Amino acid sequence: MVLIRVIANLLILQLSYAQKSSELVIGGDECDINEHRFLAFLYAGGYYCGGTLINQEWVLSAAHCDKRIIRIYLGMHTRSVPNDDEEIRYPKEKFICPNKKKNVITHKDIMLIRLNRPVKNSEHIAPLSLPSNPPSVGSVCRIMGWGSITTPDETSPNVPHCANINLFNNTVCREAYNGLPAKTLCAGVLQGGIDTCGGDSGGPLICNGQFQGILSWGGIPCAQPRKPAFYTKVFDYLPWIQSIIAGNKTATCPP
């Protein structure tokens, strides 16, 4: 994926963290066409991020995926050949935590998008439910996206790729990156070789069938040994998400 370019006063932060806003899944295989009905393809002059449909009118992605104009594809599999039920939507409203530190991209990296028109369930479109419980360390988790399938040179696939990774104790990411933002999950494969990558940002981390994370950051090159990616922890933001959807547009994210 194309890496997000951060303004000059964030260059020091980039030495410690590498943003994966346009990354693909490394070490995965083509997703089954029926396993990603909730997966959104975010386009702004080119594919740059993923997202997750959580009901007929709302998509969750990463805050760093926000752009002025976004086209959202749902029901897509092969980029060059649209499905019959593929839909295009635009944001009607976008919500980012009002207490997010604007100069720290990793802080509260979550964005809720209200679509300009609801979508209907179809053969290739259906929402993914929000988690009912937090994930457990050791869980097997599914990653997916149209991000780069090679690293460091990037190769963008025509179809989404999927792979399985493991959920780690957050100390693994703290040791790898000299820190870890709050309300974050750490996931990957310790020996390397499987990972999200450029273009996968904003896409889901699905652990034991539940939508638990939103891809935020990871190492560059992707898929290095002992360099897991980290994901915004969806469960910790449930009160904010549910309040916004219920109409409380001034809801504040947890500290």
From Swiss-Prot:
Expressed by the venom gland. It is an enzyme of class 3 (hydrolase). The active site is at residues 64, 109, 201. SUPFAM superfamilies: Trypsin-like serine proteases. GO terms for cellular component: extracellular region; secretory granule. Its main location: secreted. Residues 19-24 form a propeptide. One of its GO terms (biological process) is proteolysis. Residues 25-246 form the Peptidase S1 domain. GO terms for molecular function: serine-type endopeptidase activity; toxin activity. SMART domains: Tryp_SPc. Pfam families: Trypsin. Keywords: Disulfide bond, Glycoprotein, Hemostasis impairing toxin, Hydrolase, Protease, Secreted, Serine protease, Signal, Toxin, Zymogen. Its EC number is 3.4.21.-. The keyword Hydrolase applies. Belongs to the peptidase S1 family. Snake venom subfamily. Monomer. PANTHER family: KALLIKREIN-1, KALLIKREIN-RELATED. Snake venom serine protease that may act in the hemostasis system of the prey. This is Snake venom serine protease HS112.
